[in-house]
Amino acid sequence: MATRCFWCWTTLLFCSQLLTGFARASSAGGAKEKGLSQTPTWAVALVCTFFILVSVLLEKALHRVATWLWEKHKNSLLEALEKIKAELMILGFISLLLTFGEQYILKICIPEKAAASMLPCPAPSTHDQDKTHRRRLAAATTSSRCDEGHEPLIPATGLHQLHILLFFMAAFHILYSFITMMLGRLKIRGWKKWEQETCSHDYEFSIDPSRFRLTHETSFVRQHSSFWTKIPFFFYAGCFLQQFFRSVGRTDYLTLRHGFIAAHLAPGRKFDFQKYIKRSLEDDFKVVVGISPLLWASFVIFLLLNVNGWEALFWASILPVLIILAVSTKLQAILTRMALGITERHAVVQGIPLVHGSDKYFWFNRPQLLLHLLHFALFQNAFQLTYFFWVWYSFGLKSCFHTDFKLVIVKLSLGVGALILCSYITLPLYALVTQMGSNMKKAVFDEQMAKALKKWHMTVKKKKGKARKPPTETLGVSDTVSTSTSSFHASGATLLRSKTTGHSTASYMSNFEDQSMSDLEAEPLSPEPIEGHTLVRVGDQNTEIEYTGDISPGNQFSFVKNVPANDID
């Protein structure tokens, strides 16, 4: 409730600053402003009513969106929305500080020589300087006169324009985030037809283990291996061009799907890989909509370096495009290297070629590094587009900021192109290729499985209590869950990949959030139980609990016996 109230207040503040700026602009000609004591009460009430209605409607709209996401179990998108609201609050808080500190900022005077240095536009002529000086004196109604040879640190008009920039950043951040997510989901929606093909007899025939083929004759290897892959320059040049013409094809999707299921699920298990990729994209979107302190620092650095003649605006527009192209090329190169890896391991394959993913394919063995680079590129690109429209609104389309208008058109085109390329191609490609890393993402677990595993965890703690273990002992950081099919650390959200032959979804994460829409095609209210023999290592007592039976939300878990770790093969 406090967050909602603060957001309303900051929205009111933004609107009031807009009105204040318009009033200052209209009174800059020299007419003396009247205070509230000389203003009709109906005018004050009318303006306040308008601002209150706008603020409440905006807050209610965001609240309705959050409620809809919660009802649809879109947890990742709900967290992304909360991040956006938090960032809007930060912008509102900055505006609040500027408003209450305006009278003190206007009293700060600096020498004229310092005020004439590092200007974003060319210095005005003498006639223009006199005209500008008279305008500043007329507009600075709340400031005190500076001494001779000194000027205000930021004039009142400049503070108002800074408020407008913050308002544009808030509005365009919401719009930019919405476009990014919609384009990514639109791309992944096109993969649904490929997922439906996996239920056909033709697909069953293609993955039949009794069907042997030469490796170099498979579609995946043919598309990604050729004479140019043996020469480094042509290798990366081909990967660079592929992102524009064929970023993800049907063969790529089906091959990576087959490799993921073979590594993490039981043979023959039905799994909706397209839904899983969509949820994985939502998790990635939750990251890229945030504004970290590092991104705020880049915003301040750009404002500092935006000096006339330095062409900082041009380089800041080029940088996001270069980063997005580099990341897309790297992702295409990973697909090609996985295809080459198949040819190096096998001369003959059974059914669909089995790809083996690893973090070694990514820069510094860190798949998340690519996402952080995309996060930085998206923020910079969004800010450049926002900056263009802010300059257009505040100074005009052909102002001193846009001395070369043709170059401005090129930069604007690059910004829009980078938005489409990253949202429609790079982010969906990242969500698909990173499934071939060494770690399995938590989005693989459906909601019913997550509840079953949490219940299993509570049962383990109860059993430990009955066994007279210390009450503070839990499945903590040092605990690991060992199964007959996969193993990973139980303390976090990272799941280690391992080659498996059985169920690997019977795993636990202590900080796991419920996910929506089961990927496993089972009954919605009665998910298929997980059968198997499970060993759970508890604490540092070097003991293991043996569990045999089914794991399902409705079952009670029974732990047969406590077996010393050294007695288990």
Curated annotation (Swiss-Prot):
Topology with respect to the bilayer: Multi-pass membrane protein
Parts of the chain on the Cytoplasmic side: 63-85, 185-286, 330-372, 435-569
Cell compartment(s), UniProt: Membrane
GO cellular component: membrane
GO biological process annotation, one example: defense response
Superkingdom of this protein's organism: Eukaryota
Coiled coil: none
Pfam families: Mlo
Extracellular compartment spans: 1-41, 107-163, 308, 394-413
Transmembrane domains' residue ranges: 42-62, 86-106, 164-184, 287-307, 309-329, 373-393, 414-434
Keywords: Calmodulin-binding, Membrane, Pathogenesis-related protein, Plant defense, Transmembrane, Transmembrane helix
Region Calmodulin-binding, residue ranges: 447-468
InterPro entries, A to Z: Mlo
GO MF entries: calmodulin binding
Main location class: membrane
Record note on domains: The C-terminus contains a calmodulin-binding domain, which binds calmodulin in a calcium-dependent fashion.
Family note: Belongs to the MLO family.
Annotated function: May be involved in modulation of pathogen defense and leaf cell death. Activity seems to be regulated by Ca(2+)-dependent calmodulin binding and seems not to require heterotrimeric G proteins.
PANTHER family tied to this protein: MLO-LIKE PROTEIN 1, MLO-LIKE PROTEIN 10-RELATED
Stated name of the protein: MLO-like protein 10
Gene source species: Arabidopsis thaliana
